[in-house]
Amino acid sequence: SVGFKAGVKDYKLTYYTPDNQTKDTDILAAFRVTPQPGVPPEEAGAAVAAESSTGTWTTVWTDGLTSLDRYKGRCYHIEPVAGEENQFIAYVAYPLDLFEEGSVTNMFTSIVGNVFGFKALRALRLEDLRIPNAYVKTFQGPPHGIQVERDKLNKYGRPLLGCTIKPKLGLSAKNYGRAVYECLRGGLDFTKDDENVNSQPFMRWRDRFLFCAEALYKAQAETGEIKGHYLNATAGTCEEMIKRAVFARELGVPIVMHDYLTGGFTANTSLAHYCRDNGLLLHIHRAMHAVIDRQKNHGMHFRVLAKALRLSGGDHIHSGTVVGKLEGEREITLGFVDLLRDDFVEKDRSRGIYFTQDWVSLPGVLPVASGGIHVWHMPALTEIFGDDSVLQFGGGTLGHPWGNAPGAVANRVALEACVQARNEGRDLASEGNQIIREASKWSPELAAACEVWKE
């Protein structure tokens, strides 16, 4: 017959290839698929592969001008999810040529751009991605990474301590700077702009930057330690964001901050490049992540957003606590914490890791634990997150009955006590409360904190 065969056709004929060997250069995705009643899983999986790569709903004659076999995504394996009715994990392989080099934005537009509103699916969740070495190498990644950050700050062998300045909205720049000074003077390494602090009428960004820089240098001079404050450079336009980062660099501060999901990956990658070129560390907040990752059967798991951030660039990222006010399951959280820090992570389904990921020496990111944590959580946090982490106590510092500086002292004493106990070989899991109690005997600030927040 002449021409091509017009009409609607089953996706699974073209896009379901169960015997297909994946290539080392493919991007692999694991989707949790919930098909509509009556839709077979093979068709649902194939539909996902098609819609997120070369497919469209009907045969088009321009298909003849390209090599589908070379460019199509393939659903190469489907398995039922244990304990769930009518849920499947569909594995899809995408040829590398479908993606623009060094663009997280394009990667997401392709893989999750269109397919989530698909009629044949009740729900769809992207659980994990395997980024091939060849694609990882097209990204700059974190501006500096864990080792360089430790060298810049001259802080080794312990987690770093931070504090988000509260009340998050309403303080004047000068009072804000004062709170920053008190926390840093008391013994914290970092203080942080809240994610919603950008440049509002009650406190414009330039004033805040100035007073925070002053606070930082004063605390630095008095303690002999290097201090930082995450100056939030997030803005309404990329140009304005870079302008703020430039001002931070001119002040000579060590670190700026960005909300990478609300700001967007394009803006984030631009900022990360600026930060590497100009010696700024970059702290990343994940505001809006729960909109995307909270539902168990639809959206995207946070580990995917975390991987994307490591490609796009950031030196710190918030990653849940396992113990405070925001939810997080221990094994799963540790799974993506390792994905952020380590150079090579083995596939381990019990920790939610669907693929072995090699980062080929891309710098690592420090996970930040924050949200409803206080001194009694310190042993658990030290044990769970280890040395390469930032522990952030907002209310857990500023809520101290004697004020901000004593709150900072309490946290620093608790941390040093836990690190020392661990180095002496004690078991933080079972002796944690005991360790904190012992330390509070010679630190009145810590004793007061222990009173306010009961174990």
Curated annotation (Swiss-Prot):
GO molecular function list: magnesium ion binding; monooxygenase activity; ribulose-bisphosphate carboxylase activity
Modified residues (N6,N6,N6-trimethyllysine): 5
Entry note: cofactor: Binds 1 Mg(2+) ion per subunit.
Gene3D superfamilies per UniProt: Ribulose bisphosphate carboxylase, large subunit, C-terminal domain, RuBisCO large subunit, N-terminal domain
Keyword Metal-binding attributed: yes
Role this protein plays: RuBisCO catalyzes two reactions: the carboxylation of D-ribulose 1,5-bisphosphate, the primary event in carbon dioxide fixation, as well as the oxidative fragmentation of the pentose substrate in the photorespiration process. Both reactions occur simultaneously and in competition at the same active site.
Name of the protein in its database record: Ribulose bisphosphate carboxylase large chain
Gene: rbcL
